Structures are given as C-alpha cells and as structure tokens.
Amino acid sequence: MAAALLLLRGLRPGPEPRPRRLWGLLSGRGPGLSSGAGARRPYAARGTPVGPAAAGGHAPQSLLLRILTPSFEGISGLLLKQHIVPNAVRLWPLSGSTLYFNTSRMKQKNKDNDKPKGKTPEDDEEEKRRKEREDQMYRERLRTLFIIALVMSLLNSLSTSGGSISWADFVNEMLAKGEVQRVQVVPESDVVEVYLHPGAVVFGRPRLALMYRMQVANIDKFEEKLRAAEDELNIESKDRIPVSYKRTGFFGNALYALGMTAVGLAILWYVFRLAGMTGREGGFSAFNQLKMARFTIVDGKTGKGVSFQDVAGMHEAKLEVREFVDYLKSPERFLQLGAKVPKGALLLGPPGCGKTLLAKAVATEAQVPFLAMAGPEFVEVIGGLGAARVRSLFKEARARAPCIVYIDEIDAVGKKRSTSMSGFSNTEEEQTLNQLLVEMDGMGTTDHVIVLASTNRADVLDNALMRPGRLDRHVFIDLPTLQERREIFEQHLKGLKLTQPSSFYSQRLAELTPGFSGADIANICNEAALHAAREGHTSVHTFNFEYAVERVIAGTAKKSKILSKEEQRVVAFHESGHALVGWLLEHTEAVMKVSIAPRTNAALGFSQMLPRDQYLFTKEQLFERMCMALGGRAAEAISFSRVTSGAQDDLRKVTRIAYSMVKQFGMAPSIGPVSFPEAQEGLMGIGRRPFSQGLQQMMDHEAKLLVAKAYRHTEKVLLDNLDKLQALANALLEKEVINYEDIEALIGPPPHGPKKMIAPQKWIDAEKERQASGEEEAPAP
C-alpha cells in the first residue's frame, strides 16, 4: 500500500513535481529492474532547452525537458522513433494538468450548488455548461489513466510481440536458415527468448518482430540440446548461437504489479465518481442514471411544433385544454376573479382520435416548459425505479415552474389497485401509482405544475387518480362527426396534389367514412397518394380515393388467391344475399358496392354499405340489421341446400346484436327493462355476473328466439325475390364488382324509397363535368 501511495504521489503534479519518478515508470527502468541492454548512459546537454521550453514553455515542462533530453531506451525510444510522441514534453499533457488532479475547485462548486437559487433559463444553461465541464474534466482524468495503463502494458509485453514458437519451428525455420542472432534463457519461467537478425525471413515472409518465445521442458539442458542441433546442422564453432541467461528481479515485478493495481483502482474510482456526478439525484451511486426520469422537453418557442390551428375538429376538447394555456400565459386574468386552474386533465377517447396530437399542440401553444413521458417508461424490472422516476420528473417540473407534465398512456401506471388478499397484485406498479398520487396532490405539492394525461382505457384507472385535485378535468375526444371529418380531410388534403380543389373531395369523403377516426382519415389520404404514384399519375384522382377507402375497409385485392368455380358461385350468392336483403328492407344502409374479389384480410368478398351518423336505434332497426347480416347464410342455404363456414363473422355480429338487445337495451319483454354490463373475466378467467343462473338461461333463450326470428324473416324475403338473387349473383360472376347503379338497373329502385348514399358513379360524373367545363386540367391517363 505504501508503494501504491508513493506511485500516486509521483503521478500527481504539485509544487515540487517528480518527473524522474514518472519517466522512470514510463521508460521501464525502476529500482531493482535488470535488463540485458546495458547500463544507463550519462545525461548529455542537460541544460540545453529545446522544443517548447525554448519558446517560453511552462516551468514544469521545462524541468521535465531538461531531465529527459538524453537518448531514450525501451518504449520511450520506440515512441520517439515512430513519431507517436514527437517530443518528450508531449508526455506531460497526457498526464493531465494541475487542475485535473485538484479537487478543491470541485468541492467549492458543490458548495455553490447547495445554495438556494431560483431557476431561470439562463441558470439552466449555465448549470448545464458547468456539468458538461465537470464531466469533461473527469473524462480527461480517465483518459490519462488509460494512457498510463496502456504504456505500462506495452512496457511489459514489448518482449512478447513476436508470439510463441515450437522447437521444430525454431530448428527448421530459424536455426537452419541462419536467422537467429542470439538466445536468452529465463530459468525461472522455462522460457527461451529467441532474437532474430534484422530483416529475418520466417515461414517465407519477412518479419517485423525480432523476438520470439519458446517453451522448453528441461531448461537446464537447453544449451546442450541447442549444441546438439547445431552439430546435426554442421554449423561451425564461430557461427554458433550465443546463449545468455536472464534473471528477473522480484522488486521490479512487485513494483509493476502495484503500479497496475493502483492505476486500476484509480480508474474504478473515477468511473464511479463520474457516474455519481452525472446523476441529478447526487450521491456516490452508479444507479442514478436508472432513477432519472427519461422525459422529453418540448420547446414551444421554436415554432416548429403543432399548433391548435393544425388540429382539425375536436372543437370542445380544444376549448377545454386552451384554458390551461391561457392560465399559464396570463394567470392574473384568472387570479383577480379568484379562479383556480384545474390541477390536471385526462384526455379520453378511442385510439386514433387525436389525444397525443392535442397534447403536442398544448406544448407548442403554452410557451412554457413541457415535460413529456410515456407511462410504460416508469416501470422497469428493478423494484423502486418507477417511484424514483416519478420523483425525478416532478422535481424537474417544480424547478421549471410554471410547467406542464404530460404522461402518455397513463393506464400503464394508473391501474386500479388490487383490493384482494390473494397476493397477485403488482407491488411495483402500485408503488409507482402511490408516488404519482402524492406528487400530484400531496403535502409538498406546489402550484403552477399542470399534469396532462391520455389513455383509451379510462375504465381501468384508479379512482384516486381521477378525483378532483388531481386529474379533475376529463376531456372526452370521441370519433369525429361529419363536420369534423370534413375538416380533418381538408387538413390532410392540403399536402396532396389534387385534380380538383380539396373542397370537392372533403365533403364526399366525410360522408363515405362514418365511424372513422382521425388516424384512419390520414391513412386514407396517404393511401390515395401512394396509389396515384404507383399508377404513374401526376395528381390524385377520385378513383384513387375510392381505392384507399376500399383498402382501409376490406384490405387490398389479393389477385394471387384463385378460387374454384364452385367457391366463386358460393361467394357470389352469399354477397348477393347481403345486398338484396339490405336493398329490400326499410331501415338498412345503402349498398354502395358488392365485390367477390378476395381480400388480404382473409375475406373472400364484401358488400360495402354506407352507414349513417346515427346514435339512437329502434328495435326494428336493430332487427333488420340482424336480417341483413344473415342474408348471406340464408342465400347459401336456399341456393345450394347447404351452408359453409363463410358466415362466421356474420353470425358473430348477429349474436352480439341479439344479446345487446336482451341484456343491455331492455328490448326483451320477458326479461324487462333491465341493463347488465358486458361480461368481464375475473381472476383465472372466472367472470362475475350480477344476475342469477336462471336469469342467464332466460336471456340466452330470448337471444336465441331473436336470431331465429331474424333468420326466418330473411329466408322469406329471399324466397319472395329469388329471381333478383339469381340476377345479382350472375352479374357478380360476370363482372366481379357491381355498384349502386348496376344494382338499380338489375332489380329496380329500393321499394321503400331511395336511401341516403353517395354513388361513386355520380361522383365520377361530377368530376368529369368539372373537367369538361375547363375548370381544372384533365386527369392523366
């Protein structure tokens, strides 16, 4: 230990530097080290300054230069000859300046950091630059220690640069060819060092390494064995290889081991110190980085983000979240009236409706720090990291107040806490949730930190998270209405090169896509542009949008799937049954298109209807929807006297509608006006039902009666119009795709009056009329 401390003192420049000891370590000549290279030569030109010292260098460098001026041996000489280190004085910067080995400044900075001060953007930048300087300083120290360790390793392994050889290679490739200059025996290790002549050729190639090692079994009889080999090779006495013996000193090996140990410990100390500095939690811990909240800071002042004008639709939601932005921009307008801004808001709604997009707009418009983090990033495998990251996130938010914290997909950490004693609860998630509750509204909660969160599973969130004082404002973002869909289409059509103005497409596309989310609408616009580019068009046309809508609904046509003639007939009658029942009944949607082309979503055909924006349904409307879904199954049974598995999805829809009418809508007279929630699976797949087994049997019976009644009614409609069913099926087998105009020409208009629809043929005719009038250029062929 004393030797290690002595070595470290020699590495640390101070008022009285010790360059002799440093260079002795670098050159490999320490006390007690023996070498066969000869004795140290006396110093020459000791007082003659050269290099940087002659130009007025620093005093430590001048002192080191005066001592290191003579010719060098070992690794130092090799470095100088190869111009890796052009001058010995260059070794001084490698070991670091006096600042790098002085910790007094660091301690003073740490004391300054402990002083309380308010954070401004300038302070944040200054603190960031200071931490970068400190990190750079410790990296320089690590770099210096690595260089010292590398040099010491080179000094120790320089003699082994040629590798090991066998006795046969030594005799046949070296000794017999006269390439050996001398041999040195190391008795303690049973190793023989073979030194070659400069420019020696071994194994047919010139070798740069002039020393090789050879392991010998009986080192005492090596010289005898060597002379016997020379006799066999008829080598004359004057050309015999000289043999010398080398004994390693114990003190030199011990000093080298202590030096490497000291350097290794110093490297480890600096690594842990650097890790402790990097963590914002402070302290000497390498796990501080794991505890840091990995949030994203959104700077709204750059002007590159999403504004409220870029968010189409969602008028009510934008109005509610705009209050947070107005409060952060001008809080005095609210405070003078005694109003308090809500502590947080929860954005709810189906996937793809724009919750995250609205949060991005808030980040841009608020002009305050916006810290965004995803819910799954809180929870890791290591226990306790979730709570630590919550503390880190809110600590940073309070330092930057006024500030907005946004947690996306909060259901990952905000699920309801388990109340059972079964032991299956997730303790890590509950700890994270508890810490989040405390940070949002606890003893140390401060104002001017607003929390935004989004999820599409509000039913699983804990009640304590959604109470007033935490996420007290719930903003529901539902699927867009007709007007909102038109605005969203207008927004996404701005970036496309269209044949007609965007207003020509937006209203029609909005009517074609009821129930579509904003993400679906963006996908339709993108698919239309991709299809136009794939077809080689110079602009996006109407049929490109038709293709995009059809692709999103049913998938793209799969031309590689070829059906047999019999299967094509079954699919044609199946789809004709859907279309005919929907055409003849009163409360069904308009049939826009019927196709028997296979699709990539495993559908062998589809009937495209035009659903209406309808929120209330009568019993008759739901019943006729069941009949329309059963039209394909009934058409198969009537036409072929058998049924296939193609109606699986239709039967699933019919069953769901029937049970909804009985269990939730109260439309079954025998059950009465009661409503039960949908069945949810509990622990181990066992569901809890709020009704008896007898009532369940009654509801099953009522649902079965409804489905049977709908099927009988569907069969009657098809049997009364069997010729029309045959005509539709034949047209499908001939054309593969028929639309509203084709159906009307085949079987006449709907008996209950024209249905609300957007006919693709009329849309195309309208576009052609515009083009004929010269308002826009003609579409590309």
Curated annotation (Swiss-Prot):
This is Mitochondrial inner membrane m-AAA protease component paraplegin. Residues 109-135 have a biased composition (Basic and acidic residues). Forms heterohexamers with SPG7 and AFG3L1. The m-AAA protease is either composed of homohexamers of AFG3L2 or heterohexamers of AFG3L1, AFG3L2 and/or SPG7. Component of the mitochondrial permeability transition pore complex (mPTPC), at least composed of SPG7, VDAC1 and PPIF. Interacts with MAIP1. GO terms for cellular component: axon cytoplasm; m-AAA complex; mitochondrial inner membrane; mitochondrial permeability transition pore complex; mitochondrion. Disruption phenotype: Mice are affected by a distal axonopathy of spinal and peripheral axons, characterized by axonal swelling and degeneration. Mitochondrial morphological abnormalities occur in synaptic terminals and in distal regions of axons long before the first signs of swelling and degeneration and correlate with onset of motor impairment during a rotarod test. Residues 36-56 have a biased composition (Low complexity). Its main location: mitochondrion. The chain crosses the membrane at residues 145-165, 249-269. Residues 22-56, 103-135 are annotated as: Disordered. It is a multi-pass membrane protein. Upon import into the mitochondrion, the N-terminal transit peptide is cleaved by the mitochondrial-processing peptidase (MPP) to generate an intermediate form which undergoes a second proteolytic cleavage mediated by proteases AFG3L1 and/or AFG3L2 removing an additional N-terminal fragment to generate the proteolytically active mature form. It is found in: Mitochondrion inner membrane. It comes from Mus musculus. Keywords: ATP-binding, Hydrolase, Membrane, Metal-binding, Metalloprotease, Mitochondrion, Mitochondrion inner membrane, Nitration, Nucleotide-binding, Protease, Transit peptide, Transmembrane, Transmembrane helix, Zinc. GO terms for molecular function: ATP binding; ATP hydrolysis activity; ATP-dependent peptidase activity; metalloendopeptidase activity; zinc ion binding. Changing residue 575 to Q: Absence of proteolytic activity. No loss of its processing into the mature form. Expressed in the brain and retina (at protein level). Catalytic component of the m-AAA protease, a protease that plays a key role in proteostasis of inner mitochondrial membrane proteins, and which is essential for axonal and neuron development. SPG7 possesses both ATPase and protease activities: the ATPase activity is required to unfold substrates, threading them into the internal proteolytic cavity for hydrolysis into small peptide fragments. In the N-terminal section; belongs to the AAA ATPase family. In the C-terminal section; belongs to the peptidase M41 family. HAMAP family: FtsH. Zn(2+) binds at residues 574, 578, 650. ATP binds at residues 312, 352-357. It catalyses: ATP + H2O = ADP + phosphate + H(+). Binds 1 zinc ion per subunit. Residues 106-144, 270-781 are mitochondrial matrix.
